[in-house]
């Protein structure tokens, strides 16, 4: 059991951290203050102290015009920590802190993966040069930012000639009360992604108190054997006598850490509001406690999206990989991709998911086109649109890397073969980006006909994968499907290969279904029969068209007969009421939650576009609706606004997450822009003016930016004053813009009192403007005590409150 320290910001605030002063500059200008804080933690039980470098990456230091001093500040911080250790506890170790940049990566934001990687790489190199024992990437709310920071840390460690025995890399996420990060990632998904990429220790810090975090630690422990770290807040902050107070006393916090230790954490400490006294209490409690023995987790083959994890294998129900996002043999799709349109790609994705696809295969191989930008665009679009994990289907190493880099999850690579060029290009990418890898038994153009030869070649590919550091649970096998036209024995050999794979390796198996019938008549019938036999022979994951009625029915029937459909519930749901005399087509079934594009009602089609994030398609629909004489206000109220209400409800119930909400909002904005282009006088579409700002002293604006974007995309004129804004500036902006509503936020507990000051300044100016407040550390109670009119817990709540308020002004 290792005890980390507590909050640095809380302690700096106690010794007089001034608003507008960079906390990390203490390492250079007032090192004795930082050393004294470290000393207090060491004297109160800390085995590991964390450097005062939470905001010391270049992108954060830009806020203080200190971006050219990254190396100096970080090395100074490590030096101060080491001096404290040498004097007060020589056995202790140093963790180099790297906090969030405050930016979202594309497509949620405008930062590229490489730019975020570069800023973390610079900081990690400085911390390692200084001599840290750990890199601790903490308080991260977006898995893409964590992936960039983790890769940067791994690369910096390797470049310095260090190993994990020298410098361990810790990944700590922050989760909201709903058990997910702000961008929708649950603990088990976050853990799976970073473990596959090479994290050494995984856990949670900030955002919640011990009692709320305990079940989240249990979820992490359910999917990994890696060490777990937990550093909760001292409860959620409260406003008492205009001072920010964390409710958990030191005496209360220690015992509350016992369930966290029993859940699996072996590294514990504190975050916001915790002091040396809290750490002493935690140390006393956990070191006197004998933790429960942690269950060993057998590794499983899993892939994820940003929000969803699925397991593949012989011990779980077979899954479908949808094959439709592939321009091969699809002239219309190929031409649309040449034209830069992804409308059909997105509709294919939605239709396949609705029809039962568990994974979506993504192939951007258009003849004469560079796959790399097409693949990047596809990954951006699909990762925002659907929860379904993706399979990256390309032979182009550049396209493969850009897809893996920008995919916010653990993808499946389709595929690697036995050729040296394929192995040396693909396997390092799978290892680097934590992807699962499909192995195809082909080498030098040779297509082994016999099952035994395929198995032998597959074994050689598997052994090469082990040499690159991949593990058995990272690998899947393709039995190789040759068309019946190539020989009457081809189907039998594929089925034999499946059986041998299961017997020898036990890995999940994946194969393209439609290859078997190429060049044959009655293809759907042959495909369905072959699928049934393949599933019975050990196929776990067919690549198929789930919209094809015959293939889908064969799949559901087979899984029912093989015992994967308890009570035949899925079969009855799909086919129990079917008229056996009819010959159904290949259309995707329309479920009750599926917005339809086929309605004769133009407003219904517009609503469907918003709900499904069809920001390209909605332009033509709005143009047609206007041409047909539909009033712009009806388009806005009965089309766009109603759709966003549905999106908001789904967000509130956990059916949609921030990426999907942002995409829907962008679609709505595209519609507004189209209306205004065609009817410039449509000023009545502007709902009102809202001033937004982050309060004085707070340099964090990520949450404010989300709220501003959602409000703007919902038809409001936004006056964004930025971050660290003086109350007087906010007051003047309200006057200048005649704003009826102002939104102010604070992320830092140290700047929460500025919410009170800003509201007081607005009231003193005699303004009747309604004040809406929010932020990670703000609660309803805090908002009430501060005198706010509205508390918005998130961006959707802000939009709903704004809609309700402006409706009262009409």
Language-model-detected regions and their locations in the chain:
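Domain-level signal for soluble alpha/beta catalytic cores
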Residues: 1-476, 482-810
């Amino acid at each position: 059991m290792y005890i980390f320290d507590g909050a640095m910001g809380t302690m700096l605030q106690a010794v007089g951290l001034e608003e507008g002063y960079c906390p990390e500059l203490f390492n250079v200008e007032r090192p004795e203050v930082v050393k004294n804080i470290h000393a207090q933690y060491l004297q109160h039980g800390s085995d590991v102290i964390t450097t005062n470098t939470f905001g010391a990456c270049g992108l954060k230091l830009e806020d203080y015009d200190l971006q050219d001093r990254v190396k100096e500040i970080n090395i100074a911080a490590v030096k101060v920590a080491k001096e404290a250790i040498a004097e007060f506890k020589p056995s202790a170790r140093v963790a180099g802190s790297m906090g969030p940049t405050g930016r979202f990566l594309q497509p949620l934001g405008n930062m590229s993966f490489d730019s975020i990687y570069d800023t973390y790489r610079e900081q990690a190199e400085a911390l390692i040069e200084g001599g840290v024992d750990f890199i601790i990437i903490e308080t991260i709310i977006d898995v893409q930012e964590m992936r960039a920071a983790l890769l940067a840390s791994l690369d910096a460690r390797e470049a310095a000639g260090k190993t994990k025995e020298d410098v361990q890399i810790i990944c700590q996420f922050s989760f909201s009360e709903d058990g997910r990060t702000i961008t929708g990632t649950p603990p088990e998904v976050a853990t799976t992604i970073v473990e596959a990429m090479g994290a050494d220790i995984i856990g949670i810090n900030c955002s919640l108190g011990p009692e709320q975090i305990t079940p989240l630690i249990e979820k992490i422990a359910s999917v990994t054997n890696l060490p777990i770290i937990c550093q909760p807040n001292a409860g959620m902050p409260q406003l008492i006598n205009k001072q920010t107070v964390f409710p958990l006393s030191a005496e209360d916090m220690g015992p509350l850490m016992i369930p966290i230790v029993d859940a699996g954490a072996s590294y514990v400490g504190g975050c916001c509001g915790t002091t040396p006294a809290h750490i002493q209490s935690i140390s006393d409690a956990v070191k006197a406690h004998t933790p429960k023995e942690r269950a060993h987790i057998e590794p499983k083959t899993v892939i994820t999206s940003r929000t969803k994890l699925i397991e593949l294998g012989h011990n779980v129900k077979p899954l479908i990989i949808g094959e439709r996002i592939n321009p091969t043999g699809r002239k219309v799709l190929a031409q649309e991709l040449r034209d830069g349109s992804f409308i059909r790609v997105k509709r294919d994705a939605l239709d396949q998911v609705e029809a039962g696809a568990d994974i979506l295969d993504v192939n951007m191989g258009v003849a004469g086109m560079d796959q790399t930008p097409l693949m990047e665009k596809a990954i951006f679009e699909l990762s925002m649109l659907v929860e379904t994990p993706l399979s990256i289907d390309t032979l182009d190493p550049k396209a493969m890397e850009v897809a893996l880099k920008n995919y916010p999850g653990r993808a499946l690579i389709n595929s690697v073969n036995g050729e040296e060029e394929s192995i040396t290009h693909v396997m390092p990418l799978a290892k680097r980006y934590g992807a699962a890898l499909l192995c195809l038994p082909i080498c030098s153009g040779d297509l082994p006909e016999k099952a035994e030869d395929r198995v032998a070649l597959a074994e050689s590919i598997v052994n090469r994968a082990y040499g690159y550091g991949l593990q058995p649970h990272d690998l899947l096998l393709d039995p190789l499907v040759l068309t019946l036209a190539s020989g009457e024995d081809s189907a039998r050999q594929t089925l034999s290969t499946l059986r041998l794979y299961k017997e020898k390796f036990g890995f999940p198996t994946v194969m393209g279904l439609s290859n078997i019938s190429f060049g044959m008549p009655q293809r759907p019938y042959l495909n369905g029969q072959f699928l049934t036999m393949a599933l019975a022979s050990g196929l776990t994951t067919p690549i198929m068209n789930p919209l094809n009625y015959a293939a889908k029915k064969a799949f559901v029937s087979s899984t029912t007969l093989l015992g994967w459909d308890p009570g035949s519930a899925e079969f009855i749901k799909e086919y129990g009421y079917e008229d056996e005399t009819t010959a159904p087509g290949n259309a995707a079934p329309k479920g009750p939650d599926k917005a339809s594009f086929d309605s004769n009602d133009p407003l219904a089609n517009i609503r469907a576009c918003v709900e499904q994030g069809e920001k390209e398609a909605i332009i033509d629909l709005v143009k047609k609706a206007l041409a047909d004489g539909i009033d712009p206000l009806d388009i806005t109220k009965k089309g766009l606004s109603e759709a966003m209400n549905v999106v908001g409800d789904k967000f509130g119930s956990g059916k949609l997450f921030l990426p999907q909400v942002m995409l829907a909002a962008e679609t709505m904005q595209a519609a507004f822009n189209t209306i205004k282009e065609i009817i410039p006088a449509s000023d009545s579409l502007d709902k009102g003016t809202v001033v937004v700002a982050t309060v004085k002293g707070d340099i964090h604006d990520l949450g404010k930016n989300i709220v501003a974007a959602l409000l703007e995309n919902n038809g409001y004129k936004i006056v964004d004053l930025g971050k660290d804004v003086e109350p007087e500036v906010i007051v003047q902006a309200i006057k200048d813009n005649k704003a009826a509503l102002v939104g102010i936020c604070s992320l830092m507990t140290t700047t929460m009192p500025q919410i009170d000051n800003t509201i007081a300044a607005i009231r003193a100016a005699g303004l009747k403007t309604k004040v809406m407040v929010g932020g990670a550390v703000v609660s309803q109670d805090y908002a009430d005590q501060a005198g706010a009119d509205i508390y918005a817990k998130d961006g959707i709540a802000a939009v709903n409150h704004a809609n309700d308020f402006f409706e009262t002004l009409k």
